[in-house]
Amino acid sequence: MSGRFALFRWSQSLATLPGFPVGQAPHWNISPGNQVLFLRHVGGELQAASGRWGLTPPWLNDLSKSPAHARAETLSEQPMFREAFRQRRCLLPANGFYEWRGELRKRPFWLTGEGSLLHFAALWEAYPAGDQVYLSVAMITQPAAHLRRPLLLDEAQQHAWLAEDTPLAQLQALLLIPTPPLRERVLANLVNDPKLDAPECLTPA
């Protein structure tokens, strides 16, 4: 499962988007429950926002059960994700993500793309609480051999995913796109500590 990723470097064009958080800090070890940067369309305009990684629909009573992931194969049918899939799609920018492999002793791997940023398909929700509205997201994952990985979108697919008028059939087709080729390297075990959020997370084995 894609339980950790990193966003420690971004472009100037991303940093100048409306809603980009003031003082956005670099992170090397983002886990479910953390605040994450995400991109969405608001009135047809691309905007940035910050939300909790763990989807909290307005009707959810037990916030401890907020899912961090949504399976691409079933999200269009599940009540937790169905409405957000149709109306509240977003992207999670990342420099890469971590993957643990092995039978007895799992080793962490760092996976990146050709460019400086990857974009994960995701869903967002707004949770009203008193006079505050809290935003949250769920990462969409797809099967990759015996693992699950984020659903990665290229530039054209990103536009289609965010557009409010994309037909449902096209959205469902995006859920089936294969994982593109990725670069990977095995890491030391420092990243295993979820409290470590520093460049040392990427220390090679």
Set out the residue ranges of the language-model regions.
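A motif-centric signal for short, conserved binding hotspots located
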Residues: 51-53, 111-130, 137
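Extreme N-terminus nucleophile/cap motif
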Residues: 1-55, 168-171, 181, 198-204
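Residues within well-ordered beta-strands of beta-sheet-rich folds
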Residues: 89-93, 121, 140
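A glycine-rich, hydrophobic loop/mini-helix early in the fold
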Residues: 45-86
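Catalytic cores of histone-lysine modification enzymes
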Residues: 89, 101-116
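C-terminal accessory segment of soluble enzyme catalytic cores
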Residues: 1-7, 13, 68, 133, ...
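Conserved SET/PR-domain catalytic core that frames the SAM/AdoMet-binding pocket
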Residues: 80-103
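Cytochrome P450 core scaffold surrounding the K-helix E-X-X-R motif
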Residues: 62, 99-106, 159-162
